[in-house]
Amino acid sequence: MREILHLQAGQCGNQIGAKFWEVISDEHGIDPSGTYHGDNELQLERINVYYNEATGGKYVPRAVLVDLEPGTMDSVRSGAFGQIFRPDNFVFGQSGAGNNWAKGHYTEGAELVDSVLDVVRKEAESCDCLQGFQLTHSLGGGTGSGMGTLLISKIREEYPDRIMNTFSVVPSPKVSDTVVEPYNATLSVHQLVENTDETYCIDNEALYDICFRTLKLTTPTYGDLNHLVSATMSGVTTCLRFPGQLNADLRKLAVNMVPFPRLHFFMPGFAPLTSRGSQQYRALTVPELTQQMFDAKNMMAACDPRHGRYLTVAAIFRGRMSMKEVDEQMLNVQNKNSSYFVEWIPNNVKTAVCDIPPRGLKMSSTFIGNSTAIQELFKRMSEQFTAMFRRKAFLHWYTGEGMDEMEFTEAESNMNDLVSEYQQYQDATAEEEGEGEEEGDEEVA
């Protein structure tokens, strides 16, 4: 079996991670004690990817939970599925990172990282053939960003040929916890560009907009945001957890999605969007799902795909539906909006279908786009970073932990390079096509 080892770091990472395990345990028919109560052999066929079968037929998540303070871990442990995790896999410090990337990466986090790696090794040894790692974390705080990226680089050293996949929650000015988020996020992206194979950018701003506009929630809570994140995570991992042909492992997904190694930041989307507790009962048609899925308002990253072009796209449809109809609809989208797909990668849209829909829905679709418009997110981050860094605001918190200003400058220029690379491929055309692209701002339908 091709196993995936899951890591969650920091408060945000542990909260969305715990929610992810609730959702997929439910989809695989596993109750909070780790016992299988399902009704479909498909649920068990690839259960080993995410779960270890322990004695007495119990299924235990291949998950390592990390934090620099005990608080969030305690709430995960006392949460709905808290008892399903292996107790030894909770690794936590007492000091906290105080939203300081340097503490997570160089001081506090560096002290804890070896005990985390011990647990990771132990989990990796129980794997038959480990395909890679996935990390849930946020980029705005101290632990998820600083220690999360430290873990990534340490794991990279030890398992250089395994795929590294992250679900990274990107800070946004509208939903801000901390004034130093732009520093933490820029320093993290500096690491992610070099050390991960696939990063799903999940953006609080986009999640808030979805809650306000589409779900009509007047005061969205983190619970509502996490509900959206877990639906998306469940969707993008469907191909890895259920039998299927397309993108059935992390490496195949990377091969299909990443045309240039640095450009591996994906924009996820989900349809139909439903709020917690009120899953819609009206059946959606395949055309509606396809239309919604490509709609800018459904993207989980606050970038408008109409401002850029898709390098590659993967779509996952779930539920009982006609493959023929799915293929027709996907072709239809590409033909109608051909200017939004780069013409120098033919067949750059791939589609997978899985029979088992998520709970409460007849069918759903998940979207993974590698779009040049993601540069908007990095630009936004970079502008905020520069505004503070020019004045050296708050820098003493970082230099006090032994960091050098040079590292800030490098991170800043690496991020700006990333933006220019996206721009370069957005403008590139196939030679014979010339520059005859007219960019309309019409709705992508």
From Swiss-Prot:
One GO term of the biological process aspect: microtubule-based process
Residues modified to 5-glutamyl polyglutamate: E438
Organ and tissue specificity: Brain.
Residue segments, region Disordered: 421-445
The entry's keywords: Cytoplasm, Cytoskeleton, GTP-binding, Isopeptide bond, Magnesium, Metal-binding, Microtubule, Nucleotide-binding
Chain intervals with Acidic residues compositional bias: 429-445
A Pfam entry, by short name: Tubulin_C
Subcellular location: Cytoplasm, Cytoskeleton
GO molecular function: GTP binding; GTPase activity; metal ion binding; structural constituent of cytoskeleton
Motif interval(s): MREI motif: 1-4
PROSITE patterns from the UniProt entry: TUBULIN, TUBULIN_B_AUTOREG
Highest rank taxon of the organism: Eukaryota
Modification after translation, per record: Some glutamate residues at the C-terminus are polyglycylated, resulting in polyglycine chains on the gamma-carboxyl group. Glycylation is mainly limited to tubulin incorporated into axonemes (cilia and flagella) whereas glutamylation is prevalent in neuronal cells, centrioles, axonemes, and the mitotic spindle. Both modifications can coexist on the same protein on adjacent residues, and lowering polyglycylation levels increases polyglutamylation, and reciprocally. The precise function of polyglycylation is still unclear.
Alphabetized SUPFAM superfamilies for the sequence: Tubulin C-terminal domain-like, Tubulin nucleotide-binding domain-like
Cofactor: Mg(2+)
Broad class of where this protein is predominantly found: cytoplasm
Role played: Tubulin is the major constituent of microtubules, a cylinder consisting of laterally associated linear protofilaments composed of alpha- and beta-tubulin heterodimers. Microtubules grow by the addition of GTP-tubulin dimers to the microtubule end, where a stabilizing cap forms. Below the cap, tubulin dimers are in GDP-bound state, owing to GTPase activity of alpha-tubulin.
Similarity comment text for this entry: Belongs to the tubulin family.
Subunit structure: Dimer of alpha and beta chains. A typical microtubule is a hollow water-filled tube with an outer diameter of 25 nm and an inner diameter of 15 nM. Alpha-beta heterodimers associate head-to-tail to form protofilaments running lengthwise along the microtubule wall with the beta-tubulin subunit facing the microtubule plus end conferring a structural polarity. Microtubules usually have 13 protofilaments but different protofilament numbers can be found in some organisms and specialized cells.
Protein name as it appears in the record: Tubulin beta chain
Annotated organism of origin: Pseudopleuronectes americanus (Winter flounder)
